Structures are given as C-alpha cells and as structure tokens.
A protein has these predicted regions:
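Accessory beta->alpha helical hairpin/"wing" motif in late/C-terminal subdomains of nucleic-acid enzymes
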Residues: 276-296, 300
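Long, charge-dense tracts
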Residues: 2-139
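Long, compositionally biased intrinsically disordered regions
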Residues: 1-42, 46-51, 292-368
Length: 368
C-alpha cells in the first residue's frame, strides 16, 4: 500500500453496517483492519476485490472506486495462477522454422492486398477460452488492455496468417464499446503461444493501431507480423489509411518505446508525420545518417519526433481519418444539447436524443 489512506477512507464500505462501531472507535492500521476483516484462508487482495464487487453500485462506479485505491496485487504461484510458461492454446500441429526468419521490411501497402488465409468464428465457450488466455498473457507481464478486460466471448474470431501465425480478434461487450470507433484487441499467436498483442480502432476506412511484441519474442519477424496485422485489419474494416499515435512511438512518457527506437521502425515501414517541424527534423536526421552511417538519434531527438501521429495512406491521402478527425467536437455537441434541453435529467435526455437520431437514420429503436 503506497497510500493506505485511500483504502482507509472506504473501509466502512467493505464492511457491514453492524461492524461500524468498531471501525469508528478503534484506530488500527488499515492493514490490520483488513487482516481482521478477511477470512482465515483468504488473502487480503482477494477480500478487497470480492467486497468491492459486492457493493450495491453499478459496475462503473465500483470500478472507479477500486481503481482509485491504486492497489498493487501479487500473484502467488499455484495451479490456477496465470503463467507465461504454460500459456498456450492447442490449435493443430506445430509448424517448425525450416528456413531463415523473415527479417526484411515488407511493402505494407502490398501486404494489405494479401488477405488472411482464413477466418474462424469461435463458439462462446472457445471465445471465452481465448479471452482468458489474453488476460493471462497480459497480467503476467504487468500489462492491461480494456479490449481483453471487457472482451465479448460471442465476438471472437481467429485469422489464419499462415505457418501457424494466428490473430485472435476480440471485440468488446456492447456496454464498453466506444461511441464512434470499432475497437478490437488482437492476441498474436505462434503455434498457439501468445507472442504479442494489438489494439485497433477503426472508423471511415481508417485504423489506429497499437502493435506490441512481448519482450521474449522481439528481434525476429516483427515487420512481417505487422504486415499480416494490417492485412487483417483491412479485411475486417476495409481500412486503407493507418495511423500510429505518439505513445506507440515513444511519446507521452513511453521510455521503452524511445529506447527501442520505435519511431524509426515505423518510419522505415513508410509511415510519415504530417507536422512540418517533425518532417524537417526527420530529414535532418536522415542527412546525418547518410553522412555518418553509425549515427543514432538521441533520446531527446526521438522524444521530439514522437510528439505527433504518423500516417500511412495506401490509397489517396485524406483528412477524414482517425488521428485527424476531431472526435471531441461530437462529445461537446452532445453535451451542449443535453445541457440546453435537459440539464441534470440526463437519462430522459439520452432516450429522447436516441429516438431523434434513430428517426433521422431510419433505425427501428425497438430492434436496437
């Protein structure tokens, strides 16, 4: 507990009302209170999670309260604990590497024209199995992804990219989907073993992609796999324009991205910034590399380069793409309309505006 006061302030919510006389009068440290409240065979972390889940509140409120506690949880080894070693889904015979690794840089716009070899829509049971595998793959690396945390077991597909390279596309449960973009998480599998993940948002034939290879599997066929990811995204959403946001490039405090030279990885695959200052800095660095082949961009330079989105247009360059569309204007327009017409009565306003939108779009609200 880095800030025990946060847990102490909500302790009464985790206990029963009949326990409050002791909580009010006795000043035990919060850790001692948790030890007294939990069961003899129950861990402190399990107690807090279970009691938070039992609160008489909506899921978003419970989630917000729990996140505000800022707890660090330790996974104890055991038969039911997620494991990197045993993370695997059996989906056919293994394909062994019989030739050199594909370490070159593919022509991404040519790659997107080669669709996956096949796609399989999973049953709810198999979909949940893949979601559980994705969650375990993340938590054992101290990572998290909403698309996996709120994955919909009825919206899971496996894309066959050849040589037992597969992408498990996981959609989100309806109540967690974004208002405008279609968001999917992809678990990257090689011979059934998770080797990375992708987060993709799609709208208007454009896609914003966050591509990650787990550290164990880096330095191999990253560019080749990236091309297969783009081809899958095109097959799913018809995307012809792709963007990478600053965090993936090493911006917004992503020191790991800076150290790995992520910005140049995408630059060499054809992505370009639109910001003139960023383009000038890129050209300056390229000139220095030409003069001195051993030159490497400094961390401060990479941090400057990573301040802006980069884009790749496989057809015509256009502005109606993710990264350039002002989504915030949509939210502000909705807020203004709700405030002007309904004020605090947001529930009534939501229903009224939904009916008006459905009427304009010719949608039968009764059928959703």
């Amino acid at each position: 507990l880095e800030e025990p006061g946060k847990l102490e302030r909500v302790l009464h919510l985790l206990a029963l009302y009949s326990e409050t006389p002791a909580l009010d009068e006795l000043s035990y440290p919060v850790r001692e209170w948790i030890d007294r409240l939990k069961g003899p065979r129950e861990t402190d972390g399990a107690f807090i999670v279970r009691r938070t889940r039992a609160l008489e509140a909506g899921p978003r409120l419970r989630e917000s309260l729990y996140e505000d506690l800022d707890l660090w949880l330790r996974l104890a080894p055991g038969p039911g604990t997620p494991s990197r070693t045993h993370a695997h889904v059996p989906r056919g015979p293994a394909v062994f590497q019989a030739g050199p690794l594909r370490t070159g840089r593919p022509d991404l716009c040519a790659e997107v024209q080669r669709p996956p070899l096949g796609v399989e829509t999973l049953s709810r049971r198999e979909g949940q199995r893949i979601i559980d595998l994705a969650r375990g793959s993340m938590v054992t690396r101290s990572r998290d992804l909403d698309a996996f945390a709120y994955g919909d077991p009825e919206d899971v597909r496996i894309f066959d990219c050849g040589d037992r390279l597969e992408l498990a596309a996981i959609g989100m449960i309806p109540e967690r989907r974004l208002l405008l973009e279609a968001v999917y998480g992809f678990l990257t599998l090689k011979n059934g073993v998770p080797i990375g993940y992708v987060l993709n948002s799609a709208l208007f034939g454009s896609a914003e992609m966050a591509y990650n290879v787990f550290e164990t599997f880096r330095g191999a066929e990253a560019a080749h796999i990236y091309g297969r990811v783009m081809a899958t995204v095109r097959a799913l959403f018809g995307a012809d324009s792709f963007t990478i946001y600053p965090y993936q490039l090493g911006g917004d405090g992503n020191d790991e991205g800076l150290q790995s030279g992520a910005w140049w990885f995408y630059q060499k695959l054809g992505f370009r910034a639109r910001n003139p200052q960023t383009l000038r800095l890129m050209r300056s660095e390229l000139r220095r590399m030409k003069t001195n082949p051993g030159h490497r961009s400094s961390i401060p330079t990479l941090r400057q380069l990573a301040e802006e989105n980069v884009y790749l247009h496989c057809e015509r360059e256009r502005d109606d793409v993710i990264g350039l569309l002002p989504f915030e204007n949509v939210g502000m327009a909705i807020t203004s309309s709700l405030a002007r017409r309904f004020g605090s009565d947001r529930s009534r306003g939501e229903g009224a505006l939904a009916r008006e939108a459905a009427e304009r779009l010719g949608v039968d609200v009764g059928r959703g």
